[in-house]
Structures are given as structure tokens and as C-alpha cells.
Design a protein with these regions (language model features):
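Polybasic/polar functional segments that serve as interface/processing modules
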Residues: 1-115
Length: 115
């Protein structure tokens, strides 16, 4: 999991991103397209066109890091491109990385009795 401090903001770059990009070009996209500082310690999340891959970049004060996750089944839930840049919580990011709909997480059924 991504080592984050409490109070770290998580930003989704809505729409799709070319997943061939590395951390430097994603940081440039944060600066130019989103109008934010990629070195401020916030997490920036990008999704590819096929929706099964996300990349996350963040600067921890020492250097830039890149995290990538591909789902074996399903797709990452993503806001529509008209929404611009969207801030979510760290818990919502954890749901997203587990393949759960972060907008409306549902409890899973757990039986109380066996048999």
C-alpha cells in the first residue's frame, strides 16, 4: 500500500490518460492540465482508456514516486470527464485500489451461522 501521512489529499485526474507516460510526464500533466503543484505531497491518480489500470504519483519530500495497479477483473470506477479534477479521501482511494465502487461502498454479506 502507499505510505501516506494523515491529511494527504488525493486528486483524480478525470478522463483518460496515456498510460505510456512516466512520472515526469505525469507530473507535467498535473502542473499544466490540472494547475496544481506535483511536489506538494498530494497524491494524483490517473486512469487509462481501458479502465483496468491506474497510476498514482506523489512527492514525499525526498523524491517523486510512481505506483501502478492493474485489475485482473473489472474496471476502476471513474467520474465523467465533465467533472474536472476531483478530490477523494484516502479511504475512497483504498476502496478504489481494491476494485470496489468508491462512490458507494456496500457491505458484503457475512453469514453469522455455519450450517
Amino acid at each position: 500500500m502507499i505510505p501516506t501521512r494523515s491529511g494527504v489529499r488525493v486528486w483524480l485526474a478525470v478522463g483518460h490518460t496515456d498510460m505510456r507516460r512516466g512520472m515526469n510526464s505525469l507530473a507535467l500533466q498535473v502542473q499544466q492540465a490540472l494547475g496544481r503543484d506535483p511536489h506538494c505531497g498530494d497524491l494524483y491518480v490517473f486512469r487509462g482508456r481501458r479502465a483496468d489500470l491506474v497510476k498514482i504519483i506523489w512527492h514525499d519530500g525526498v523524491g517523486m514516486s510512481l505506483y501502478m495497479k492493474r485489475l485482473e477483473r473489472g474496471r476502476f470506477i471513474w467520474p465523467s470527464p465533465a467533472d474536472g479534477c476531483l478530490q477523494i479521501s484516502g479511504a475512497q482511494l483504498a476502496y478504489m485500489l481494491d476494485g470496489i465502487d468508491w462512490r458507494n461502498p456496500l457491505r458484503t454479506y457475512r453469514p453469522e451461522l455455519a450450517g
